[in-house]
Amino acid sequence: MVQVPRRKIAQLSAALTALVSMPALAHPGMHHIAGFASGFAHPLAGWDHLLAMLAVGLWASQQRRTMAVALPLAFPLVMVLGALAAAAGYALPAAETGIAASVLVLGLLVAFAVKMPAWGGLPVVALFAAAHGYAHGMEVPAGSALATYGAGFVVATVMLHLAGLVAGHLIQVRSAGNAVRALGASMAAGGVYLLAAI
C-alpha cells in the first residue's frame, strides 16, 4: 500500500488543476465557460467514464509510490492525445468497446490488487486513456473551443483520479484493502454489463 502524504496530494491536485485550467481562463466569455462546464460534466455524466477514472485512482492507491503518481498523471495526458486525434479526424475503431473494457480490466486489477512495474502498467492505462479521450474529443459541443472543453474534462478526470487515490488509501488503512478490492470487483461487474450493452 502506498503512503502518499496529504500535503503531496494537495500540491499535485492544485498544480494539475491550475495547469489544465489555464486555457479556459485565458479566453474569457460565456461560450468558453460553457465549453469548460460541458467538458467538466462529460466524465461525470457517464458511468463508463466515471467508473474508469475512479478505478485508476483506486489502482494507484495499491501501487508503490512511483506508480501511484505515474498512473493518475499518464491517464489525462494520453487522454488529451486521444481527444486531439478525434478532433483531427482520425478514426479509432471500437472506441466504445475499449471504454467499456477499461471498466472491466481496471476493476479486475483493483479487485486482485495487481502490482505492475511502469513498463507494464502505464501502457495498459494509456491504451484505455486514448479511448476515453477519443470519445471526449468526439463530443465537443458546437461553438466550444477544444481547449476550454478539454480543460474541463481533464480537470474532472484528475479530480476523479485523486478521489479514487485518496479513498483507496483511507479505506486500506481501515480495512486492510479488502473493501477496495470489493469495490474493484463491483466495477468489473459494471464493465461486464457495459460490454454486454454495446
Model-derived features with residue positions:
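Membrane metalloprotein/metal-transporter helix-bundle signature
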Residues: 2-198
